[in-house]
């Protein structure tokens, strides 16, 4: 991990621990110079800033480095006059935070598509190509950290590039509510309504939080109607489908269901490895396959935690001056994750899949090529690969001594089917639950 990336992670921890005024005053102008012998070197603009940071924030910086895996967290401050400092370090925080902007990291190009998110991705691409005409509104739901916000921002970037004249607004439900409260208090409702009802693409994150807020629901109802009737595109994200959002007004629920509702599921093992590979490549790093697979097997819940685990492993290796191997990754994550044992026995997976299809296990592992056996066998190979540590050659041996290329073909075939066939997606979920 580069020294800039290490410092960014340190800043994220510090920002959660102090006030915004403190952060902007003392940390916004610090610049990382490099990492030498495990010591993070930082540039500050004045000797006064150096002394103040050393006396008041040294422990916080060391704590942040320790969380990244540094065994002996150390940093060094150096005065570099060229580093710009705020003119007024006692400047008050702005009355209103700047409006959210699209995250430049969230694009279609770096969104890893897998069986868990293929439909949501396809719908988002369709909307980006023809906003206001395809799937309006588009409602994307799924657990925390699975890529809903990434897809929304990706649509925003794509629309901005294709249709630069269109006005785009991204907002979280919390921000929408807070701005509404401020607008009511300051008698600026006309301005508030104009802001949201004059856009061509409205992206609303975490819309489940609108539930139970009567005035917010009332205002959003009219905003939704104004945009929909003008054929403007609306994209909503939530952690659950509209029917499961308790205390959501029926009229809003019905409107959320007017367009397309699509979900994002947790990524399977192959998709998690692909996500880690892309993250590593974006940072110009080549990480051994077995190290990536180890991390992918430890973090199964969501992409945000998966990427966080990778960053921790990279930082641990960088700060301790070692190569990132499987063993180093295990050490870096040891205090967060207990080593995950095999989640299922390969033979048990084969038996469960055979039972589901009314077959005998030996029919799946045998050489028969009957049509009714081919797909169950491919599904069994796929699940053994996902739910155990068995290598491709080992899986081949389980299935009658088949070549590893045959196993790889079966896995890829199931992935292709799952991307386009919701029945196969559901079948995989059912079998996965039965096997774990």
UniProtKB/Swiss-Prot annotation:
SUPFAM superfamilies: P-loop containing nucleoside triphosphate hydrolases, TrpR-like
Comment field on protein domains: Domain I is involved in oligomerization and binding regulators, domain II is flexibile and of varying length in different bacteria, domain III forms the AAA+ region, while domain IV binds dsDNA.
Taxonomic source organism: Thermus thermophilus (strain ATCC BAA-163 / DSM 7039 / HB27)
Record protein name field: Chromosomal replication initiator protein DnaA
Keyword entries, A-Z: ATP-binding, Cytoplasm, DNA replication, DNA-binding, Lipid-binding, Nucleotide-binding
Location(s), subcellular: Cytoplasm
Domain of life, per lineage: Bacteria
PANTHER family in alphabetical order: CHROMOSOMAL REPLICATION INITIATOR PROTEIN DNAA
Assembly description: Oligomerizes as a right-handed, spiral filament on DNA at oriC.
Chain residue ranges for the region called Domain II: 80-100
Family from the record: Belongs to the DnaA family.
Annotated residues for binding of ATP: 145, 147-149
GO process terms (BP): DNA replication initiation; regulation of DNA replication
Main location: cytoplasm
Region (Domain III, AAA+ region): 101-317
Entry function: Plays an essential role in the initiation and regulation of chromosomal replication. ATP-DnaA binds to the origin of replication (oriC) to initiate formation of the DNA replication initiation complex once per cell cycle. Binds the DnaA box (a 9 base pair repeat at the origin) and separates the double-stranded (ds)DNA. Forms a right-handed helical filament on oriC DNA; dsDNA binds to the exterior of the filament while single-stranded (ss)DNA is stabiized in the filament's interior.
GO molecular function, one term: ATP hydrolysis activity
A GO cellular-component term linked to this record: plasma membrane
Record region (Domain IV, binds dsDNA): 318-436
Region of interest: Domain I, interacts with DnaA modulators: 1-80
């Amino acid at each position: 991990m580069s020294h800039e990336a290490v410092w960014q992670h340190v800043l994220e921890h510090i920002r959660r621990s102090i006030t915004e005024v403190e952060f902007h005053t003392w940390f916004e102008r610090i610049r990382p110079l490099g990492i030498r012998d495990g010591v993070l070197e930082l540039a500050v603009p004045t000797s006064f800033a150096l002394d103040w940071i050393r006396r008041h924030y040294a422990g916080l910086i060391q704590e942040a480095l320790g969380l990244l895996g540094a065994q002996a967290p150390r940093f060094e401050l150096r005065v570099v006059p060229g580093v710009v400092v705020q003119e007024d370090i006692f400047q008050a925080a702005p009355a209103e935070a700047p409006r959210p902007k699209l995250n430049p990291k969230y694009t279609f190009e770096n969104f890893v598509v897998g069986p868990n998110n293929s439909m949501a991705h396809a719908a988002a691409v369709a909307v980006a190509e023809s906003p206001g005409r395809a799937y309006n509104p588009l409602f994307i739901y799924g657990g925390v950290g699975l890529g809903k916000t990434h897809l929304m921002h990706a649509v925003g970037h794509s629309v901005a590039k294709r249709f630069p004249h269109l006005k785009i607004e991204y907002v979280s439900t919390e921000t929408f509510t807070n701005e509404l409260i401020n607008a009511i208090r300051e008698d600026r409702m006309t301005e508030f309504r104009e802001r949201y009802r004059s856009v061509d693409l409205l992206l609303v994150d975490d819309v489940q939080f609108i539930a139970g807020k009567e005035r917010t629901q009332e205002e959003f109802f009219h905003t939704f109607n104004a945009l929909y009737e003008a054929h403007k595109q609306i994209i909503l994200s939530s952690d659950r489908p509209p029917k499961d959002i308790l205390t959501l007004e029926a009229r809003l629920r019905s409107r959320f269901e007017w367009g397309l509702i699509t979900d994002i599921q947790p990524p399977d093992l192959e998709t998690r490895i692909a996500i880690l590979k892309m993250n590593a490549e974006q940072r110009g790093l080549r990480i051994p396959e077995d190290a990536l697979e180890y991390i992918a097997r430890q973090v199964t819940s969501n992409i945000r935690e998966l990427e966080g685990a990778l960053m921790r492993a990279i930082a641990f290796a960088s700060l301790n001056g070692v190569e990132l191997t499987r063993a180093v990754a295990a050490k870096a994550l040891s205090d967060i994750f207990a080593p995950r044992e095999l989640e299922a026995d390969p033979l048990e997976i084969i038996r469960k899949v055979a039972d589901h299809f009314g077959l005998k296990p030996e029919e799946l592992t045998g050489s028969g090529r009957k049509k009714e056996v081919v797909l169950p066998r491919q599904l069994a190979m796929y699940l053994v690969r996902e739910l155990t540590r068995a290598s491709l050659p080992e899986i081949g041996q389980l299935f009658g001594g088949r070549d590893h290329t045959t196993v790889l073909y079966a896995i890829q075939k199931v992935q292709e089917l799952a991307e386009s066939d919701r029945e196969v997606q559901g079948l995989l979920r059912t079998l996965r639950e039965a096997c774990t």
